[in-house]
Amino acid sequence: LTSGGTINGQAQRQEITASSFISSGGTLRIPSNMWVWSDSTSTAALTIDIPCTIINDGKIIGKGGTGGYGQYPASGYSGVGNGSGQDGGPAIKINSSVSGVTITNSSGAYIAGGGGGGGASSVEPANTYAGGGGGAGGGTGGAGGGVGTGNNGGSGGALNAAGSQYIVPSGVAGINSA
């Protein structure tokens, strides 16, 4: 950070707070080569806690939501999301006690909340369970869940994310045992 309020020398910063870089009434410029991100859907990438001006020439992105878990409804599997993807996180939070904030998003820059995680699916009678993909911003893919399983999902990412897939063979744990 220079005395003028520009973040320099780093390609990315995690979960920043305006008052850590500028004084009240100051201007914080996020340069075009900068990514500001969050690793938590409950924490914004940029928290504004003072009156200020933010000029975004870069990218401010929230954490992507976790993908849902694929499951057969009768299996009793209760993974996170229970088949539904989770919400993504915010890109920017302005504290409720703060007023006098101006945000300018330059051409080519973006401010994006994390994408919601994809929902899961299960197919009967083939017993194929596919977890949903994680949301943009780094959400984790959901697991495919068969009877008695707890498969881990794949890692998410800004470009793509996928969960695991699990196929229950006929006759396992009484499923398709005809």
Segments and roles (model prediction):
Residues 1-114, 118-178:
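Glycine-centric low-complexity repeats
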